[in-house]
């Protein structure tokens, strides 16, 4: 027991760092488990689309949307979400929503808005369309 006390007294900084890391890990794990939304990868998104009839909401600009988007996705630019202009997707409140975001720093604010609008099952496509493209998954291109 004296050896433990001696070790602790000589290595205060090391012990402090370990305690900080432990608290941070517990915080992030708890936050992830209690979060209402989840970050999903491409294959989880495909499974949600095929099995649960998830609706893909692409929050990128119309120009980016026309350059390539997921089949049957609905374009609702991020600014419209924050302004409350979501008439196109209000009828889908009972379905899971998969968000395609280009501005990852606005994820939390966007999710909060969707929960305020009454959507209960909101998912975020991890890394937006970047990994969708790198996995060679199909994109629809509109030239109009």
Curated annotation (Swiss-Prot):
SMART domains: RHOD (SM00450). Residues 50-140 form the Rhodanese domain. InterPro entries: Rhodanese-like_dom, Rhodanese-like_dom_sf. SUPFAM superfamilies: Rhodanese/Cell cycle control phosphatase. Transmembrane segments: none annotated. This is Uncharacterized protein BU052. It comes from Buchnera aphidicola subsp. Acyrthosiphon pisum (strain APS) (Acyrthosiphon pisum symbiotic bacterium).
């Amino acid at each position: 027991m004296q050896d433990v006390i001696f070790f602790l007294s000589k290595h205060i900084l090391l012990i402090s760092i370990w305690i900080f890391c432990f608290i941070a890990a517990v915080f992030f794990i708890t936050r992830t488990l209690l979060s209402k939304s989840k970050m999903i990868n491409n294959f989880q998104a495909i499974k949600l689309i095929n099995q649960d009839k998830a609706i893909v909401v692409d929050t990128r600009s119309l120009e980016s949307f026309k350059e390539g988007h997921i089949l049957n996705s609905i374009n609702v630019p991020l600014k419209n979400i924050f302004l409350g202009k979501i008439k196109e997707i209000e009828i889908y409140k009972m379905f899971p929503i998969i968000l395609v975001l280009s501005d990852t720093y606005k994820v939390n604010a966007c999710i909060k808005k969707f929960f305020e609008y009454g959507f209960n099952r909101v998912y975020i496509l991890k890394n937006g369309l970047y990994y969708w493209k790198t996995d060679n998954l199909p994109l629809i291109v509109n030239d109009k």
